[in-house]
């Protein structure tokens, strides 16, 4: 995954540089752009699929920790937000070319992916208390630990600074 991500970022930078050059001297070499697009589409699709698989596994582990910390009083969700979820990347790249030329960077792709964290159906970053946000962060870290432990058959070291700050007494005791 890491090699694909590094290659994707390198090609993305090259594509963006070409888009910027075209803005200064409008003579875009479509042949070069098509080569970049072909590579970025292939790698983008691979990255997207690997992220989807990871999130499907990770969210189950994460939820189990959050249920434990919150004593099953709150529901939590992780949603993988990606332009590629319901779209063909080749079509997205093709359809966004004019916009990319105006903005001078690639506006569509897995580099725009994000995770949405919901607590009882609401975005936790907007509506969660500091204690709820801290509980979510602890659950994320514990899920990372468990995932790495199972996947790599190692015991990772987890550093948590001020772990009990902003937590109510019940959550601290758990």
Please give the residue ranges for each predicted region.
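Residue-level detector of well-ordered alpha-helical segments, enriched
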Residues: 4-7, 58, 164
């Amino acid at each position: 995954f890491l090699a694909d991500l590094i290659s994707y970022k390198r090609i993305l930078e090259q594509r963006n540089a070409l888009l910027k050059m075209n803005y200064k001297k409008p003579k875009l070499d479509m042949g070069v752009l098509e080569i970049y697009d072909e590579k970025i589409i292939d790698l983008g699709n691979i990255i997207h699929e690997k992220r989807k698989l990871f999130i499907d596994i990770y969210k189950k582990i994460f939820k189990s920790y959050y249920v434990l910390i919150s004593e099953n009083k709150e529901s939590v969700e992780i949603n993988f937000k990606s332009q590629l979820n319901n779209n063909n990347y080749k079509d997205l790249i093709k359809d966004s070319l004019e916009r990319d030329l105006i903005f001078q960077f690639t506006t569509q792709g897995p580099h725009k992916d994000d995770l949405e964290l919901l607590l009882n159906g609401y975005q936790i970053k907007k509506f969660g208390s500091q204690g709820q946000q801290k509980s979510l962060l602890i659950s994320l870290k514990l899920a990372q630990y468990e995932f790495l432990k199972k996947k790599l058959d190692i015991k990772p070291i987890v550093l948590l600074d001020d772990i009990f700050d902003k937590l109510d007494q019940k959550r601290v005791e758990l």
